[in-house]
Amino acid sequence: MTLTFKPLESYREDFSFRNSPAAIARFPFPFPEDQYMYSVNLEPAVSRDPGSVFEHQFDVDEHYVSEMAERARVLELDPGRCLVMPHMAQAAWDTLAMLMEHLARDYPQHFRLTRQGDAWHWQNLALGIDQRFTFGDPASLPCEPLEYITRQMQGDFAVLDQRDGDLFMDAGMVTCPADWSLRFDAGMSFKQWHSPVPMAHQMGVFDRALKYLLNIQVGAPVRRLNWTLTINPRLDTSPETYHEWGNDRGKVTPDNVGRLVHLRVELQLMARLPRSNALLFGIRTYLISLDELVSNPAWAQRLHRVMRDLPDPIADYKGITRYRQTLVDWLRRFDPEA
């Protein structure tokens, strides 16, 4: 698949973000059934379906340049969105190495990496970056290594320290979260940062997930899909910016639901870092408006059924309740059996 980047689009203010027909076709629709309930739903992150979001371990798409501009803007306003605790320095270099290696291998027309021992040469042709540096020496980069590489990667990243039979969120770059804060969750254990999720704890979902994640081996990453809904194509729906987007849920009407409401899907990747034994948790976000989504009749029909029958506690947690009935009524026309 030839990768072409779209001209600069915005994820705020005028919200000029749109998906091309090709981007719609490869959107990772997250519902395999007409009903949704929490599950671990992890699978090996092996390459499949050429051209899809599952072809490469770290997906780069047409929105790359726009997303990197959005990340830079968020960091300019709030540098604390990137955090690395002192004991995570090796894991930060580990992350840089993994991301550079994958980008250069999977997208050689846009990224290049050459190495001679610790002397590395990185070229990001998409963003016009040409950097020679010494691996392991932070003074040879313009900023801390985790920040440096994640300023060039779509999606958020948490780097989890594994100790005492648990995982701790001790580093990360989070500028496009679905209503959570790295600043707040920093240092928390796996169950602590998942504590707001309703129903799943009683079902044992997180006990099973933690046991699985602790045993992930180097070279055997796993992935899963997660989802929510977002009003407008806004990437930064963080608690820190709630004053900018919190009221948007009250603006949904029968006339604008297709334009305003976006299905927000996270392709979550968990990969063991070889030098530090930390776990890299990638959260790659995809947005699609309902107007775009219903161009696929099967998706439109299924989304109607999922939203109609979604358990109330899950709808509340995902922030859907306020406009849920408007959404279901609008989607009903796309379900022949409704």
Curated annotation (Swiss-Prot):
Changing residue 266 to Q: Loss of catalytic activity. Still able to bind O2 but not DMA. The keyword NADP applies. InterPro entries: HODM_asu-like. Heme b binds at residues 38, 194, 226, 317-318. Keywords: Heme, Iron, Metal-binding, NADP, Oxidoreductase. One of its GO terms (molecular function) is oxidoreductase activity. It catalyses: dimethylamine + NADPH + O2 + H(+) = methylamine + formaldehyde + NADP(+) + H2O. Its EC number is 1.14.13.238. It comes from the Bacteria. Pfam families: HODM_asu-like. The active site is at 224 (proton donor). The keyword Oxidoreductase applies. Dimethylamine binds at residue 266. Traditionally, PAS domains are known for signal transduction, sensing various stimuli. Ortmayer et al. reveal that PAS domains can also support enzymatic activity. The alpha subunit of HODM contains a heme-binding PAS-scaffold that serves as the site of the oxidative N-demethylase activity. The heme-dependent oxidative N-demethylase (HODM) is a heterotetramer composed of a catalytic alpha subunit, a FMN/2Fe-2S-dependent oxidoreductase beta subunit, a gamma subunit with putative aminotransferase activity, and a delta subunit of unknown function. Component of the heme-dependent oxidative N-demethylase (HODM) enzyme, that catalyzes the NADPH-dependent oxidation of dimethylamine (DMA) to methylamine (MA) and formaldehyde. Functions in bacterial methylated amine catabolism, linking alkylamine oxidation to the tetrahydrofolate C1 pool. The alpha subunit of HODM binds heme, oxygen and DMA, and serves as the site of the oxidative N-demethylase activity. This is Heme-dependent oxidative N-demethylase alpha subunit. It comes from Ectopseudomonas mendocina (strain ymp) (Pseudomonas mendocina).
